[in-house]
A protein has these predicted regions:
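Conserved helix-turn-beta segment of the N-terminal RecA-like "Helicase ATP-binding" lobe
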Residues: 61-88
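A short beta-strand element within the Helicase C-terminal
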Residues: 320-332
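Conserved strand-helix element at the start of the C-terminal RecA-like helicase core
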Residues: 52-53, 57-60, 233-258
């Protein structure tokens, strides 16, 4: 039996006492486990139930699936998005309906993992949803996502919104999480100081390194990027590093046209990255997405393992990296992305 942290326990109690609401927890505070424990509780009954988990990206939907299935063992899994997965996947509304109806016929539970882009397919299927969890719920206020969000807020038996960065609106013409009819009230809120005081997250330390001035950022070569990252790794004691690149092209140039990979290996670091163009790569070998995340989780849990993961915005998309202790920025970020891209080595 998992021992929840005090703030997680408060949140699960609030979810049992409310059928709709917002759960606001800082990055690294364990929002996913709160939802998982609620799902486990909902699946304890003999009556078949359907739970939907919504993520902003396919990568996160796949990682959430892996996290949920460590604890949810009595539900059939369906993915509704265009990504690859070992589970049954479809974006056709009639197939979604058929899948759920077949499971209900044999009185079995269903858990659906989808994205905001594909949520309307679940809506079109017309299935009855017991509970829906909106992960990184600030994404739901986007105009093209708000319709399905509003629908499930009114049609699902239970509806909960998880985020660290709540987005509100001051005009009736723009969706915002202060719309109580859609999002409900804030039923659980956790502050970052509480998590720091409890030792659950570590306050970030900022190191500023000065390099030579480049008048035109577009002329910064991949060799310069390599030099900047490697010198930072040499100057600061780091084990598990995220390098935030500007674009996939910058990442590909760094790996293909410099000795960055060899420099990492010479220092005892493994490396991995994943993009839509290159696919998933671990230490120079192409792997599938499931192998990528399995490797990322395994390395993250090993306190002695040193690795570098390169991505554009993996943390700001809600994807977690266990025991990440450092982030090197090669790009600018907006405030929300910057808040999400903070290491939480005690997670």
């Amino acid at each position: 039996m998992i021992q929840l942290r005090p703030h997680q326990e408060r949140a699960t109690i609030a979810m049992r006492q409310n059928s709709i609401g917002q759960i606001l927890v800082p990055t690294g505070g364990g929002k996913t486990l709160i939802a998982i424990m609620d799902a486990v509780k909902r699946f304890e009954v003999n009556v078949p139930r359907t739970i939907v988990v919504v993520a902003p990206r396919i990568l996160l939907a796949e990682q959430l699936c892996s996290d949920y299935l460590e604890h949810v063992t009595n539900a059939n899994v369906l993915h509704v998005h265009s990504g690859e997965t070992k589970h049954f996947r479809t974006t056709k509304s009639d197939h979604i309906k058929l899948f759920v109806e077949m499971c209900q016929t044999v009185r079995e539970h269903v858990i659906i993992f989808t994205t905001y882009h594909s949520l309307h397919r679940v809506q079109e299927s017309g299935i009855a949803v017991d509970t829906i969890y909106f992960d990184e719920a600030h994404n739901s206020v986007q105009r093209n996502f708000f319709g399905p969000t509003e629908y499930f807020s009114g049609h699902a038996d239970r509806c909960f919104f998880f985020t660290a960065t709540r987005k509100t609106s001051v005009t009736i013409n723009k969706p915002g999480m202060n719309d109580r009819e859609v999002y409900g009230d804030i039923i659980a809120r956790v502050s970052a100081p509480e998590l720091v005081k409890g030792g659950y997250i570590a306050p970030p330390k900022v190191y500023v390194k000065e390099f030579g001035i480049h008048q035109n950022a577009k002329k910064i070569t991949c060799d310069v990027d390599c030099e900047h990252v490697i010198s930072t790794m040499d100057d600061i004691d780091m084990k598990k590093i995220l390098v935030c690149v500007r674009t996939s092209r910058q990442l590909m140039n760094l790996m293909a046209h410099t000795d960055f990979a060899q420099q990492c290996q010479d220092r005892g670091y493994s490396f991995l990255y994943i993009t839509s163009k290159t696919g998933a790569v671990v230490d120079g070998k192409k792997v599938n997405r499931e192998q990528f995340f399995e490797t990322l989780n395994t390395w993250g849990k090993d306190p002695e393992k040193k690795f570098v993961v390169l991505h554009r915005s993996i943390l700001s998309e809600g994807i977690s990296i266990n025991r990440l202790d450092s982030v090197i920025f090669l790009r600018n970020m907006d405030v929300i992305c910057l808040l999400y891209t903070s290491p939480s080595p005690r997670d």
